[in-house]
Amino acid sequence: MEEDIDTRKINNSFLRDHSYATEADIISTVEFNHTGELLATGDKGGRVVIFQREQESKNQVHRRGEYNVYSTFQSHEPEFDYLKSLEIEEKINKIRWLPQQNAAYFLLSTNDKTVKLWKVSERDKRPEGYNLKDEEGRLRDPATITTLRVPVLRPMDLMVEATPRRVFANAHTYHINSISVNSDYETYMSADDLRINLWNFEITNQSFNIVDIKPANMEELTEVITAAEFHPHHCNTFVYSSSKGTIRLCDMRASALCDRHTKFFEEPEDPSNRSFFSEIISSISDVKFSHSGRYIMTRDYLTVKVWDLNMENRPIETYQVHDYLRSKLCSLYENDCIFDKFECVWNGSDSVIMTGSYNNFFRMFDRNTKRDVTLEASRENSKPRAILKPRKVCVGGKRRKDEISVDSLDFSKKILHTAWHPSENIIAVAATNNLYIFQDKVN
């Protein structure tokens, strides 16, 4: 994946697979840490699996930077809200890393209601020679203690521990859809359908409500919050998107409750494209600031749009992800696929964007050359270190040998979650219960 998306130079490795997928094994979020050395995935079973990149070896060039399992832990358990008689799923909705400050790693994970701060650390020594406890940790009889011992640290096999350091609960009435760490690294926000809360990492029993769009009469509700993110450099600025296809940029310096936006991004609808499904497919499923902070990228059902922060009336770029599905919206509505929430990501230099589609396809768009490519993440078509071939979807008429008909697309195979290494051309793609890593091929 050079800057012009040279698909001839893509190879892949296959990381996580269960031949017989259960609902709990389906990957629900993927996220690289700030250095790209670690890659975290969360699944519907409430588990977090962290992969660590291998150090490059001169005598094994083909194993350049492969990722192996580093730690696995149960982040969330299923719960029951007795006041509302509602089950709370253990599914991990989002994972966000904090920048590394010391030898340990910290990450946030959230399900529908509760955000947790996890510390992931290594141990390769253990203390021995306590005076009041024996080697098993049991208290010794003081009468048997005749000498004073100085405890010592003994080497042991490397062990990776994940411990919950903070639990942020009881602040969301509705389902959490986004968490975002602020650039001050002291605060973060969590967003649900109607509210956005601001948290301090040190305070778990109190949060500040910074956005509240809940009407006094719920019958007047016309839109919900679908995603939210802090600006990468300005700690006072954040954006949130809505189910109406609008994006609001807010400045926390203006007021404590950001009920008035600073900027409002919306593209006027083309009357010729108006249909029963217009409002559904215009709902934004993901919003991402570029690394530079100059642009916002949004994903709706059929397109990816790039907005300049200085121009609110229309996007500067619009990319068709799978426009061939426009004629299939009726059947996609009937099987609920039209409500799928696809994510989108930038590459490290903001020059290429990536998002998922159906049939285990994912799309890449080069913003400079305007070239795009469709690739497939599947076991049948991609063995480890094999070169990926571009795929094409045929709409009616004659179908070429290397094309796939739009009628034969498998809508149960979908790529909703992807991640891009912060500085290298390495991507992670979650296809149901399988995780794929794709990278530049070594020449």
From Swiss-Prot:
What family does the entry list? Belongs to the phosphatase 2A regulatory subunit B family.
Q: Write down the species.
A: Homo sapiens
Which segments carry the WD repeats? 22-61, 87-128, 171-209, 220-260, 279-317, 334-375, 410-442
Q: Which disease is it linked to?
A: Spinocerebellar ataxia 12: Spinocerebellar ataxia is a clinically and genetically heterogeneous group of cerebellar disorders. Patients show progressive incoordination of gait and often poor coordination of hands, speech and eye movements, due to degeneration of the cerebellum with variable involvement of the brainstem and spinal cord. SCA12 is an autosomal dominant cerebellar ataxia (ADCA).
Q: Give the encoding gene's name.
A: PPP2R2B
Recite the lineage of the species. Eukaryota, Metazoa, Chordata, Craniata, Vertebrata
Q: Which InterPro entries does this UniProt record tie to the protein?
A: PP2A_PR55, PP2A_PR55_CS, WD40/YVTN_repeat-like_dom_sf, WD40_repeat_dom_sf, WD40_rpt
Q: Fetch the PROSITE patterns from UniProt.
A: PR55_1, PR55_2, WD_REPEATS_1
Question: Which Gene3D superfamilies does this entry report, sorted A to Z?
Answer: YVTN repeat-like/Quinoprotein amine dehydrogenase
GO molecular function ontology, one term from the record: protein phosphatase regulator activity
Q: Which PANTHER family match?
A: PROTEIN PHOSPHATASE PP2A REGULATORY SUBUNIT B (PTHR11871)
Residues that the record marks as modified (Phosphoserine) are S275
Q: What is known of its domains?
A: The N-terminal 26 residues of isoform 2 constitute a cryptic mitochondrial matrix import signal with critical basic and hydrophobic residues, that is necessary and sufficient for targeting the PP2A holoenzyme to the outer mitochondrial membrane (OMM) and does not affect holoenzyme formation or catalytic activity.
> Which keywords describe this protein according to UniProt?
Apoptosis, Cytoplasm, Cytoskeleton, Disease variant, Membrane, Mitochondrion, Mitochondrion outer membrane, Neurodegeneration, Phosphoprotein, Repeat, Spinocerebellar ataxia, WD repeat
Indicate where the modification Phosphothreonine is found in the sequence. T298
Put simply, this protein is called: Serine/threonine-protein phosphatase 2A 55 kDa regulatory subunit B beta isoform
Primary role: The B regulatory subunit might modulate substrate selectivity and catalytic activity, and might also direct the localization of the catalytic enzyme to a particular subcellular compartment. Within the PP2A holoenzyme complex, isoform 2 is required to promote proapoptotic activity. Isoform 2 regulates neuronal survival through the mitochondrial fission and fusion balance.
Q: Name one GO cellular component term.
A: cytosol
A biological process (GO) of this protein is:
apoptotic process
List the cysteine pairs that form cystine: none
The Phosphotyrosine modification is found at: Y295
Q: In which tissues is it expressed?
A: Brain.
Q: How does it assemble?
A: PP2A consists of a common heterodimeric core enzyme, composed of a 36 kDa catalytic subunit (subunit C) and a 65 kDa constant regulatory subunit (PR65 or subunit A), that associates with a variety of regulatory subunits. Proteins that associate with the core dimer include three families of regulatory subunits B (the R2/B/PR55/B55, R3/B''/PR72/PR130/PR59 and R5/B'/B56 families), the 48 kDa variable regulatory subunit, viral proteins, and cell signaling molecules. Interacts with TOMM22. Interacts with IER5 (via N- and C-terminal regions).
